[in-house]
């Protein structure tokens, strides 16, 4: 087996990422816990301090930071321009889901209300002792006979989704904001069909911290969960939307999507990119962080409540000149907690949003308000074919198969300020990669590989009575002989689709322990 040696790591935060405090208008006051203190010493490039606005561009939508505006109670649904395409020019699409087929395996933390927190909130106290840390792969007893083609979670998420081979969407996990789509806010211990979407053929889904998007085979998007920052794209701001609702968008069919902590990105069939939700670090790509001074000197954020097109892509020359990059056709999009990555038709990578720890790959820690070209992938033969975003880091797979990493997974260690090859995985053909808060899991060739710093909660899958963490990439021995079609990772749990086509594969899966969670 080729060398597999480590990467950098991050200590877990006591709260669930960048927890937001209290109800607010539009985007709310800046009195909440922020990512801003993340600015750190780094291996190259300089850190930025204070609030950087990113490039000032002539004719840029939004025009940077706003200094004052009336403290109104948020945009009315009709005030924002809804993307609309005439019916006669709309593409007719029939999207297909993943070709993967297999059984779902889970490992990691399953006490959903405790994930990323010091203790279970009082309102969830009844669930305090439900769930456990699964140190090795388990099968869900309730999914016997259910074949899965896609699993979904997110680096900020304590909930998960699966799409069956029939195109049905199931969900389970934390549900305080209705992000499971079952019409209530009750926690769900094991995968359960979302009845409200049972008549739809779902091909793709995405998880934010407390919200969810689901894409149908006709290119329509349904959203549910928290909507305080407008991240559901429904034209309003509400605490919770527990049942699936179609977003306010009537443009070309959507083909891809991704969720950050409190924002969402969509890509249409023509390669246009749209964003909505929290604009705080510029992650929406509209040349603004949406900040304005409300009454009593409160800082609030002008959230995007419906999808808005990302219109400007730029590159910066060595002498600091800003040049527009024309004719960008988006092919893929990925979101971290507060940053966004895009892959275009020319295999170029753009990144923007929060710049802490070098997660944008521009050799500086400055926030970027519009998509900025990552230079490394803009050379012949050096283009990217896959992109992945972690909580505070980014990955890309080059067209020759090399894995590149930038940012940090352990924020107490040195950051990687620009894309560097991950030597540990040199020579491996990477099929699927996923990031949690600070752990990584990879499906490559016939193996599943994971690594992550202490503390971990079983998401690395090394098994009972084994080391629980590793700063070096290691094969997951508990999955020896099991082919991982796809991997996904939540804040501190992992999901795997294990191929079950041959009798030998089925037999190996049957030997894995079955997990039947306790319920109230």
Swiss-Prot record:
Keywords recorded for this protein, A-Z: Acetylation, Cell cycle, Cell division, Cell membrane, Centromere, Chromosome, Cytoplasm, Cytoskeleton, Guanine-nucleotide releasing factor, Membrane, Microtubule, Mitosis, Nucleus, Phosphoprotein, Repeat
Subcellular location: Nucleus, Nucleolus; Nucleus; Cytoplasm, Cytoskeleton; Chromosome, Centromere
Modified residue annotations for N6-acetyllysine: 90, 122, 291, 375
Start and end residues of each stretch annotated as Required for interaction with RAC1: 316-323
Modified sites of kind Phosphothreonine: 18, 340
Biased composition (Basic residues): 22-34
Induction or repression: Induced by TP53/p53 in response to oxidative stress and DNA damage.
Segments of skewed composition (Low complexity): 69-78
RCC1 repeats mapped onto the chain: 101-163, 166-217, 219-269, 271-345, 346-399, 401-445, 446-499
Modification Phosphoserine occurs at: 14, 41-44, 48-49
Matches recorded under PANTHER family: PROTEIN RCC2
Function: Multifunctional protein that may affect its functions by regulating the activity of small GTPases, such as RAC1 and RALA. Required for normal progress through the cell cycle, both during interphase and during mitosis. Required for the presence of normal levels of MAD2L1, AURKB and BIRC5 on inner centromeres during mitosis, and for normal attachment of kinetochores to mitotic spindles. Required for normal organization of the microtubule cytoskeleton in interphase cells. Functions as a guanine nucleotide exchange factor (GEF) for RALA.
Subunit organization: Interacts with RAC1. Interacts with nucleotide-free and with GDP and GTP-bound forms of RAC1, with a slight preference for GDP-bound RAC1. Binds preferentially to the nucleotide-free form of RAC1. Interacts with CORO1C. Interacts with microtubules.
Protein name (database record): Protein RCC2
Organism: Mus musculus (Mouse)
């Amino acid at each position: 087996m080729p060398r597999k040696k480590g990467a950098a790591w991050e200590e877990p935060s006591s709260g669930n990422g960048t927890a937001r405090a209290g109800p607010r208008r539009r985007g709310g006051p800046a009195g909440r816990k922020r990512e801003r203190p993340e600015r750190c010493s780094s291996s190259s490039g300089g850190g930025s301090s204070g609030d950087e606005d990113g490039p000032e561009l002539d004719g840029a939508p939004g025009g940077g930071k706003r200094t004052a505006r009336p403290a109104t109670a948020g945009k009315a649904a009709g005030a924002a321009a809804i993307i609309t395409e005439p019916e006669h020019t709309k593409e007719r699409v029939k999207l297909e889901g993943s070709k993967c087929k297999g059984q779902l395996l889970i490992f990691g933390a399953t006490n959903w209300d405790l994930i990323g927190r010091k203790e279970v909130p009082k309102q969830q106290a009844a669930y305090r002792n439900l769930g456990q840390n699964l140190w090795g792969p388990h099968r869900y007893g309730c999914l016997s006979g259910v074949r899965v083609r896609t699993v979904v979670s997110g680096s900020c998420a304590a909930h998960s989704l699966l799409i069956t081979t029939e195109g049905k969407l199931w969900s389970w996990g934390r549900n305080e904001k209705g992000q499971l789509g079952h019409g209530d806010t009750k926690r769900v211990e094991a995968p359960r069909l979302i009845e409200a979407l049972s008549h739809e053929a779902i091909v793709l889904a995405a998880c934010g911290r407390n919200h969810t998007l689901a894409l149908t085979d006709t290119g329509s998007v349904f959203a549910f969960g928290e909507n305080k920052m407008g991240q559901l794209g429904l034209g309003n701001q509400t605490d919770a939307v527990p049942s699936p609702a179609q977003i306010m968008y009537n443009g070309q069919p959507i083909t891809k999507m991704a969720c950050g902590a409190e924002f969402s990105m969509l890509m249409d069939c023509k390669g246009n990119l749209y964003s909505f939700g929290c604009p705080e670090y510029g992650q929406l790509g509209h040349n603004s962080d949406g900040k304005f001074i409300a009454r009593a000197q409160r800082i609030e954020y002008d959230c995007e409540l419906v999808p808005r097109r990302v219109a400007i892509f730029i590159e910066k020359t060595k002498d600091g000149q800003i040049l527009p990059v024309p004719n960008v056709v988006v092919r893929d999009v990925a979101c971290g907690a507060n940053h966004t990555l895009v892959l275009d038709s020319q295999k170029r990578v753009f990144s923007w949003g929060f710049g802490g720890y070098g997660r944008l790959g521009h050799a500086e820690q400055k926030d970027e308000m519009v998509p900025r070209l990552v230079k490394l992938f803009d050379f012949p033969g050096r283009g990217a074919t896959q992109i992945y975003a972690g909580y505070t880091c980014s990955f890309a797979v080059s067209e020759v198969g090399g894995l590149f990493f930038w940012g940090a997974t352990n924020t107490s260690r040195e950051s990687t300020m620009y894309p560097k090859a991950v030597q540990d995985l040199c020579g491996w053909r990477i099929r699927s990669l996923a990031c949690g808060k600070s752990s990584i899991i990879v499906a490559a060739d016939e193996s599943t590989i994971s690594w992550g710093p202490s503390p971990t909660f079983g998401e690395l899958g090394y098994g009972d009575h084994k080391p629980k963490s590793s700063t070096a990439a290691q094969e997951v021995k508990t999955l020896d002989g099991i082919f991982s079609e796809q991997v996904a990772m939540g804040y501190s749990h992992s999901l795997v689709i294990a191929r079950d086509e041959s009798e030998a594969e089925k037999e190996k899966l049957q030997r894995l322990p079955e997990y039947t969670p306790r319920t109230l």
